[in-house]
Every structure is written in structure tokens, then in C-alpha cells.
Amino acid sequence: GYIDFGEDKENEFEIEWVNTFNYFFKVALMYAKIGEADTAYHALIRLIKCLYSGTQDSKMFDIEDPFQMLNPNWDQVYDTLFSTMKQVIKDSNQLSLQAIDMWIMTNFKSTEQVLMCFNDLPSIESAILLNIEEHEYHWSTQHKLYQLLKDVYKIAAPSFDEVALIKKLVRFNSNFYVDLATCYMSRYQWKEALNTLLSVVSHLTHPSLNEEAELKLIQCYQKLGMYKDAFDISKAIFLQDQTYSLYLKTRILAAKADVLQEFLADIQPLLTFSNDRNRNMNILRICSYEGYCDRLYYFASNSKGAYGNEYRNYALKSLIYRVLFPKSLQQMNLLLFIHFIKEDASLGIIDMRKYVLTQDIQDKLLLDAIELLKQMIQYQIDGHKRHTYEQAAYECLLMKEIYEYLGMSDQFDTYYSQLFKVNSRRPLLKEALRKHVGYPG
């Protein structure tokens, strides 16, 4: 028969190059220990350049990050690399350029060591600015270089003017205006920050910066008392990414801008379910927070698929918490259930807006909770496992205590007797029910 040795050969190659590199790193460190700085430095340079090439071409080592495969003491390697570099390269300009190159090639993991290597501020700044210019199409690298330059200044000139520093960088990339605005904000110069952001928000080249700039704009508008402008941006962000946290922020701004009712009316068409679990959970949280209990119940009770029981569980907690917290109850399991809801700190529930409810509405919401429990119990029974039967029994106990609180224990007795009858051939289920709830009748 045909035997494929290809995978074994690949594994042998992987083990061989890893062992070889680990050995060469040990040898380079040994040379440094015996005072052969020049030999150690050039060996480490070649090893790191080779590994860096592998990060740029994954076919070279058949792995995206070959550094992760090796196990030398990287702190010791970087300490030795930059200390020997400082001994070998005497010209401060050349030293700064080489140090920056190596810092980039180590995937920015040698910041502590590269900072110890620098000794001349003008040459360091010149080298970093040159690299920022050369990496014009790599914003992430440019920004890390800026952060390194800032760290250098914190050590060499702690009282430096960060605004002046950032203004040197905006000519290389307009994205740096966001950092400039951030700096103004840290100085409580809200007007300057606002004008800076407005001048650049439509010219940003990195996707993550757009949202960052918009959030900073909202903050600036708020600080300047321009709530309608802050609300307009926040609403636009919320419409794109309908998270619960964004909803709350936008709602607060709507109230401050005196457009809350218009906002609540505008979002009603958005409160619909889809196939997106995260979006659906956010819809449930909003409905729970606002007290849209009928809609909450409708969504949960009509949900199918893998997440249906999760939605029902959330809606159940919301309905019970709205009606019964913080009432004193004689039903101990129900009381514990409410305690666990509070401990769990479910968003949209523990922070919900509370309203005065008539007794009829309270009773209706608890009856809706019972209907959800019936669905949840059947879901657990259909799981056909001992642990799902145990969960079904616990949910049955909660239902019993809700009926008891409502003064409708006879309705639970009817349901419970029928449950036993329908599931007469499920001894494990009946055992769990008897243990938690008791015998029917």
C-alpha cells in the first residue's frame, strides 16, 4: 500500500530548524559572556533578521511567527543584542537607526531594552521620524514609533511639550491628528480638540480610528454643552452597531438634548429579531431596560433554534425581577433565584427602568413568566439526559412557587399531574421531579 511520509518529514524539518536556532542563540549569548561583543552582536543580528524574514514570508518556516517556536530567554537575548550593539556601534546616528530597525524586527517586544540603548535625543528623534516617514503605508507601525518616541522623551526630557511633538508627525500621516486631539483633551482644551477632530474626521485612513474619533467628538461636544451634536453622532454610531452600551449612551444624550421621545420612537422599527445572536441579545436587553415586556415575551416565546432557550431564560429573569424585586417573599427558591439574578448582574435587568405596575399587570407578567417556564421545562425534557431532567425539575419548582405567590396553586397541580402522566415512561425525569418538587396531587 501507499504510505505518505510527507507529514513526518515536515515535523522533522520543524524540529531541526527550531533546535538549530535555539543552539545558535545559546552560542551567541556565550560569546557575549566571554567578552566577544562583536561576534555576539553580529550573530544575534543575523538570527533575528532571519526570523523576521520568516514573519514576512510564512512559507519560509511554514509558520506565521517563527519567534513563538523558539524558547531562549528572550529578555536575555534582547538585553545582549542592544548592549553589544552599543559597544560595537560608536556613531550615535547609526546606533539609533540600527536600534530602531532591530526593535521593529523583534515585533516591538524589546521596548525596555531599546530605551536603555539610546543616549542622544536628537539622533533618536531623527531615526524615529525617518522610520515613521518610511512606513507611510503601515499606520500601526507608525503609531508604535510615535509611542516609542514619547517614551524616549519621558526619560530624556520629562517636561516635554507633547502637543509640539505630535505636530511634528501630522505631516507624515493625518491619523496623528487624533492623538493631537487626545492630547488637547487631556489638557481640558475641549474647543481645540473639537476643531482638530472636525478638521480630520473625514480623512482618517485606519478603520478603527473613525469610531475612536467619533467617540472623542461626542465627548468634546458633551463637555462644551453641545448635546444635540453629541446625540446626532452617537445615534449614527448606534444605528450601525446596535449594542446595549451604545444604546444607553445615546439615550442619555437624547434626554440631555431634549429629543428622547423622538429617539425612542425612531428605534421602534429596529427592535426586531434576526439570525444574529448578539444583536438579538441586545434587543432583549433594550426591551428589558425600557419595560417593553410584551415585546420581550413575544420575542422569547416565539424563538426557535439553538439560542431560543437562552432568550427565554433571559426574558424569564427580566419579568420576575421587574415584578418581584425587592419584595419580601415567603417562597425561598424564588427569593434565591432573584438573588442570583442580582449577583449575575445581567445588563438590561439589574439596571432596568422601574415603573409603578398595577396588580393586573404584575399578575400578567408573572403568568407570562410561567408560560416561558413551560417551554423551558419541555426543552430540558427533550434533552433526555439526567442533568437536563434535574434542570427541568428546578424550573418546575420555580413555577410552583410563582403559582403559589399568585394564589393559583391549583393550576400548578393540574399542570404537574399532567406532566407526570405524559412522561410516565421517563423514570429518571420522575425521580428528579419527586426529589425537587414532590409527588403530584
Where are these regions (language model features)?
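Eukaryote-biased, non-catalytic alpha-solenoid scaffold regions
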Residues: G1-G441
